[in-house]
């Protein structure tokens, strides 16, 4: 691990590069450019930046319209407002006609911290998974967020990318990124731990703690929740016999359910979902809130030992 960078910042800077390479890329925001980091694109390419004001639903409709002109719209806001307030427009105006719109939402999960439960989206992955044809991506670090941004521009169809407010470690290994293909970051024989987003780093740290006790963990970064890498999930569940999923999201509808859907009726194994247990978030320092919901490395390690 090296420096800490938020995935939202990496996304914002990647948009600038992308805009230089592809003149069809346009960026829309809902009066939050300073927070979603689309401010970088606004400064570099003002003629292709559209601030729609506090009108997320309208922003999605505008993005849908721009896509019919051959443009590639990246619509940005907070996850609570994008996946929540604008859900109908995402479903009916973007996904239903299969328009090529990229919905990239920051400030997701309980790590938003002080903003509290009203702004901590713990349902967005589940909501987006439900929409037919919607691709769902959750980058683990800044490098992956950058690669995912470029990949989305090449990908044809509606997609949702979840980004974080909190700055987190950047992995030193420059592993490849391909939509729909999970990355195995650590090999172990005892437990297959599938994680996404900020929780990938916590999963790796938990694996180190458990290794010191003789428990070896495979850590798999599932950056694409939909379509999930079913082959990888099945392979490691069969290999290890114990499966744990870790996500900064409700345990209902997110990564855990996506993994369970793959394994149901195919692989017999112990299974545990670690995430937010059917409750809203609350206000506090990001580190304190993550600990409150059992999402720190030591807590994850303890839960895995309970499973074994």
How should these model regions be labeled?
Residues 1-162, 167, 297, ...:
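Thiamine diphosphate
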């Amino acid at each position: 691990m090296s420096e800490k960078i938020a995935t939202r910042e990496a996304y914002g800077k990647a948009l600038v590069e992308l805009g230089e390479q592809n003149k069809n890329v346009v960026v829309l925001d809902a009066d939050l450019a300073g927070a979603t980091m689309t401010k970088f694109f606004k400064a570099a390419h003002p003629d292709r930046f559209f601030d729609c004001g506090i009108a997320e639903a309208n922003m999605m409709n505008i993005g849908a319209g721009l896509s019919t002109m051959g443009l590639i719209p990246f619509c940005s806001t907070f996850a609570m407002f994008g996946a929540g307030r604008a859900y109908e427009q995402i479903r009916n105006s973007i996904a239903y006609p299969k328009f090529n719109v990229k919905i990239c939402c920051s400030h997701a999960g309980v790590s938003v911290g002080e903003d509290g439960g009203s702004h901590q989206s713990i349902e967005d992955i589940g909501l987006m998974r439900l929409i037919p044809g919607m691709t769902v991506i959750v980058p683990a670090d800044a490098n992956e967020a950058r690669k995912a941004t470029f990949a989305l521009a090449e990908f044809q169809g509606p997609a949702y990318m979840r980004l974080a407010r909190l700055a987190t470690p950047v992995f030193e290994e420059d592993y490849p990124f391909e939509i729909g293909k999970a990355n195995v970051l650590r090999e172990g024989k005892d437990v297959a731990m599938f994680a996404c987003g900020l929780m990938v780093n916590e999963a790796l740290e938990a694996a180190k703690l458990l290794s010191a006790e003789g428990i070896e963990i495979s850590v798999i970064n599932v950056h694409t929740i939909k379509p999930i890498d079913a082959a990888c999930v099945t392979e490691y569940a069969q290999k290890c016999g114990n499966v744990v999923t870790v996500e900064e999201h409700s345990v209902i509808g997110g990564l855990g359910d996506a993994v369970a859907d793959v394994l149901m009726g195919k692989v017999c194994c112990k299974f545990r979902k670690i995430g937010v247990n059917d409750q809203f978030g609350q206000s506090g320092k990001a580190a304190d809130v993550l600990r409150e919901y059992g999402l720190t490395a030591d807590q994850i390690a303890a839960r895995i030992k309970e499973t074994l």
